[in-house]
């Protein structure tokens, strides 16, 4: 097979998994080539590093010392300490009560917190309410990271009454209630942004400024249900599923992530999000995790992290729907040929190191795990090998996943169609009701 034909075959394999256009993939490859060229000429440029390999970035997190008159949403911004121009490498929304979090490539940074003091809808240069000491930059690298993914940064104290002015211009639009949405129909969940998350994760995160979003104001007295979409997806994939859950009983959370990133990184970030939800004021005692497609691999990785010392008391049930536990064979071929792919595609390749590690850690025996699979439209001879039209049955029913499942349920639906099947949704609601009733 010629190089061109191999590239086309790899592209077809990827498109089968993500249903993304070939144009997006080819554009991504062109951009990567251009970024490589620019980095060769300017290897110290942290902005270029962040764009080129966001999967090699670290999650930088720290606490915020809050005064009595706690502010509304804040902005955390990171500036390149060593650059003469002191460029802003990244910025994200932050909430005083929960701290700040930002993704950054290795380097030395000055961090600053901004508040919209004049209430004009923007964070501006002269609205700095807290910062790290200018002569003590935050070092971000593998040595400072506890687990290769996260770096603990200093606590930043904020003072709303003595704002200062930063050395470089800042003008960033404020996003009111950045982590609360009214429904999955919010324009925020446009499928076009989901595709951007595959190929341009930094652009995706600049838009979302977060990972986990609640439908309506969080209510810790309810059962917390966390939904995880698949590759190239958004929470809008759950448009029919969400209304099927009783709003008086369930608080729905949406894990909204750039699905081109590596699954190890995404799984650990999801684990942190779940743990944060469970530790909110009011201490929710009932948390359910429901994931679709590749989201099941992200969720499974999160569970490995959450259950290092046994099942947390609050975790009541895990449901995966049409998840490729055995990986995707066609993507495996592309990896072996050396085709450049986004990190998540590499991880879902059949036999990938990620999948091997994933299944080496068993789920706690006291965590109910319900494995749902789809076979598309059944023929006269029963379910076919092709599965739901996207993920094969052997991959959905990988023996390692079957061995850990509390129950398995098959549905004659397509890969996405299962999320709107009335019978499947009724069964899911009944399953969640049973699993989350009563004390743990």
Identify the residue ranges that each predicted region occupies:
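C-terminal motif of bacterial Sec signal peptides marking the signal peptidase cleavage site
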Residues: 19-22
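Helical cap/lid subdomain of alpha/beta-hydrolase-fold lipid enzymes
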Residues: 304-440
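Bacterial N-terminal signal peptides that target proteins for export
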Residues: 1-11
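Extracellular/periplasmic catalytic domains that process cell-envelope and extracellular macromolecules
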Residues: 104-105, 217-220, 246-247, 281-283, ...
